[in-house]
């Protein structure tokens, strides 16, 4: 590895940004907005998520191309991080009836969070040798889940009983805590992780060239089919990541409606998931470096198929916790190995551009399709059948993944030689 300290500082950003995804998207703000601010109108929360993800999906490919041309990935990451942090902190002022303010702040914060991931992921090929992509990517996701556990423990201590007259105030204060956590632990990356010096000379504006490159890449991938393995992988990733995002989004709803679990039980469930996700990220990261990310992803997708079948059959809280253990092992490893496989497939000096399609057009847009599909099945039948139906996405994604050809690499080949 080039520098263990730089890798550690890079993984700290994963540690930092999970404060937003856990507190705002998954556990606290989502319920606060739906039940308290919007008066139980859950569709408004779904609309907010969909709008933010669509915008982030459309922005990510051109932003990635611009970052490659301008060689300012860190600057772009800083800008989007600050947008997310500031808007998250301002959510403290969202109170009952402030629906428009709550929607706008969340959309901006989530765009900042999601768009920033394009530039964060694009650092990976510059940090380590190609043979270590799986392990380092796994470290990042493991740190993310450790961060999630840390911020959940802080919030559990911060929040009083739900019957307390100050409960709503401390819920709002938790948004400020999430913002501060995100900001503080992201600082080391900006101070200590440098970008490689590249010699591209620009005669046109970076924005113009970036947009042109983004258009050419889209045509190269899906019209001229110059990168068939990347095209197939992106399609497979779209499908199985869609399923993963949907399961995350509806896990608490499934638990409360099917098993009548309390909020406290649901929080403990997420603690279990995050804990096993840490182990899964480390274990499968090491496995990935030995057998390759494609085979490792295949293993995790098979586990996911067992998870959705388990959710369909589960009858009590204990069984649901066991399903959560399996999901936790798979969730971090599926995503970390996908990131390392994308890094292996991506042409050198075009990392941010291609990660723009990976994280953006295919990663973020999948957050729109899956939840809608789940909701329709749940309304037509029930939550159990909806969970089982999500297995279709895993199965088809698994089949397409097998057609992805992974390039061979030599053990002595370093990232410096690649890029």
State each model region's role.
Residues 2-53, 229-269:
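Helix-loop boundary and gating motifs at the non-cytosolic
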Residues 58-72, 280-293, 378:
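Helix-to-loop junctions at the C-terminal end of transmembrane segments
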Residues 158-180, 376-394:
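A membrane-interface helix-boundary motif in multi-pass transporters
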Residues 45-65, 271-283:
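Central cavity-lining transmembrane alpha-helices of secondary-active solute carriers
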